[in-house]
From Swiss-Prot:
SUPFAM superfamilies the record matches: L-aspartase-like (SSF48557)
Regions crossing the membrane: none
Biological processes, Gene Ontology terms: 'de novo' AMP biosynthetic process; 'de novo' IMP biosynthetic process
Keywords attached to this entry: Lyase, Purine biosynthesis
Membership in a protein family: Belongs to the lyase 1 family. Adenylosuccinate lyase subfamily.
First-level EC class: lyase
Cross-referenced InterPro entries: AdenyloSucc_lyase_C, Fumarate_lyase_CS, Fumarate_lyase_fam, Fumarate_lyase_N, L-Aspartase-like, Pur_lyase
Cystine pairings recorded for this chain: none
Organism from which the protein derives: Schizosaccharomyces pombe (strain 972 / ATCC 24843)
Name of this chain's protein: Adenylosuccinate lyase
Known catalytic reactions: N(6)-(1,2-dicarboxyethyl)-AMP = fumarate + AMP; (2S)-2-[5-amino-1-(5-phospho-beta-D-ribosyl)imidazole-4-carboxamido]succinate = 5-amino-1-(5-phospho-beta-D-ribosyl)imidazole-4-carboxamide + fumarate
Subunit text: Homotetramer. Residues from neighboring subunits contribute catalytic and substrate-binding residues to each active site.
Length: 482
């Protein structure tokens, strides 16, 4: 039964996926600790520690998944000892009595806490990467669909030379491809802390193996291998270096900037009524203004993306205050920092995929906006056409300048339509090109190589970048909880 009387994070209740929420759950955390304790015992036994029996290993295996009653036992024990790891060693030992004396043998708390965190970081990246791949894939399809639709370009959020709807989306895709590269790189760089002891010297393990350095080195590698890692950090303090957290979170923050930019562009286009995010049949935009269709999904992306971007200073500060071999300044901070970074990123990817999958454009509105600006943009072409008929460029420029300013006053001071072309048609000076004006105002002639650039980029660059992830691509519909 849900507890309505205490705070619960909206991340799990409203936004993040079930699989990401489960990854950072208490159950997954303790199950991972138990698996690490099992891996350590297996490796130590394999390397000759006779105090670890077959029965101990079998009992550890049989109880590697924690039960609800065991959580209650651990909670009571933690309250008594004020130490979560020791509480769970005690609880695991009750379930596996033959192993109670060898659980955590030679290890320090960071053997389970830090190695588990590294497992979670890598697993979380494994959940994010397919979602980012699908965002890129669907946006690429959308880009190709609208590669030939002219639209106003904007610089300084003022109308500029035309581009196409699809070409604009390639700018978003390119940033997302860089994010994908960064995600994969960060994921593959994550190593394993291994078995390093209280200050990273492996002294306790050297004592266990009676000074056999080779066995200690082999233990480090074997536990890492059993835990799914080939790369073990060669040196650590008590913890793995907190700069690793920075390296993992930085790509998430960078993606947050990408997502914020994309969502902001869509919001601005929604204001112009050119593009719209999905809007459900029963969705309400405002409790007071019944007509409103607010871009709430893109607003949510921006809200959550800002949170992701602002986590980096926290990670930097945490890394900077790790004195010598470690301090505990990091512990409670990272309990929130790491899960929230991934839960928010997961949520943003989920919303972004939902928006892209249902995003629509309104070509007639786009054309209306082009008609309002294109006459001004076409003036250079008109001047060139007149010079081909023998007109003076300087004189033609002056004629266009006067008429443009007149038309501009109509638009700005009277709220009228841009009538520059009508003024040109009513000016005898421009009679030599009357028959050419319609072709000179064909919007498709103002987009340069935008359609070709879009097609080439998607079919070559994007296709090549997504090739290693082909098996991850799906057409699955993405629904939001709210």
């Amino acid at each position: 039964m849900e507890d309505y009387g205490s705070y619960s994070t909206p991340l799990t209740a409203r936004y993040a996926s079930a699989e990401m929420s489960h990854l950072f759950s208490r159950e997954m955390r303790i199950n991972t600790w138990r698996q690490l304790w099992l891996n350590l015992a297996i490796a130590e036994k394999q390397l000759g520690l006779t105090q670890i029996t077959d029965e101990a290993i079998e009992q550890l295996k049989a109880h590697v998944k924690i039960t609800a009653p065991e959580f209650e036992i651990a909670a009571k024990e933690e309250k008594r000892q004020r130490h979560d790891v020791m509480a769970h060693i005690y609880t695991y030992g009750l379930a596996a009595p033959a192993a109670s004396g060898i659980i955590h043998l030679g290890a320090t708390s960071c053997f389970v806490t830090d190695n588990a965190d590294l497992i979670f970081l890598r697993s979380a990246m494994d959940l994010l990467i397919p979602k980012l791949v699908n965002v890129i894939n669907r946006l690429s399809q959308w880009s190709l669909r609208y590669k030939d639709i002219p639209t106003l370009g904007f610089t300084h959020y003022q109308p500029a030379q035309l581009t196409t709807v699809g070409k604009r989306a390639t700018l978003w895709i390119q940033e997302l491809l860089w994010d994908l590269r960064n995600f994969v790189r960060a994921r593959n760089d994550i190593g394993f802390r291994g078995v390093k002891g209280t200050t990273g010297t492996q002294a306790s393990f050297l004592a266990l193996f009676e000074g056999d350095h080779a066995k200690v080195e082999e233990l480090d590698k074997l536990v890492a291998k059993l835990s799914g890692f080939d790369n073990v950090y060669p040196v650590t303090g008590q913890t793995y270096d907190r700069k690793i957290d920075i390296d993992v979170l930085q790509p998430l923050a960078s993606f947050g900037a990408t997502a914020h930019k994309i969502a902001t562009d869509i919001r601005l286009l929604a204001n112009l009524k050119e593009v719209e995010e999905p809007f459900e049949a029963g969705q309400i935009g405002s409790s007071a203004m019944a007509y409103k269709r607010n871009p709430m999904r893109c607003e949510r992306i921006c809200s959550q993306a800002r949170y992701i971007m602002n986590l980096i200073p926290n990670a930097l500060n945490t890394a900077s205050v790790q004195w010598f071999e470690r301090t505990l300044d990091d512990s409670s901070n990272r309990r929130s920092l790491l899960p929230e970074a991934f839960l928010f990123t997961d949520s943003v990817l989920k919303i972004l995929l939902n928006v892209i999958s249902g995003m629509v454009i309104y070509p007639k509105v786009i054309q209306k906006h082009i008609r309002a600006e294109l006459p001004f943009m076409a003036t250079e072409n008109i001047i060139m056409a007149m010079t081909k008929h023998g007109a003076s460029r300087h004189e033609c420029h002056e004629q266009i300048r006067v008429l443009s300013h007149q038309a501009g006053r109509v638009v700005k001071e009277e709220g009228g339509d841009n009538d520059l072309i009508e003024r040109i048609k009513n000016t005898p000076y421009f009679a030599p090109i009357y028959d050419e004006l319609d072709s000179l105002l064909d919007a498709s002639t103002f987009v340069g190589r935008a359609p070709e650039q879009t097609e080439s980029f998607v079919n070559k660059d994007v296709s090549q970048a997504l090739a290693p992830f082909k098996s991850m691509i799906t057409e699955e519909k993405v629904d939001l909880a709210v």
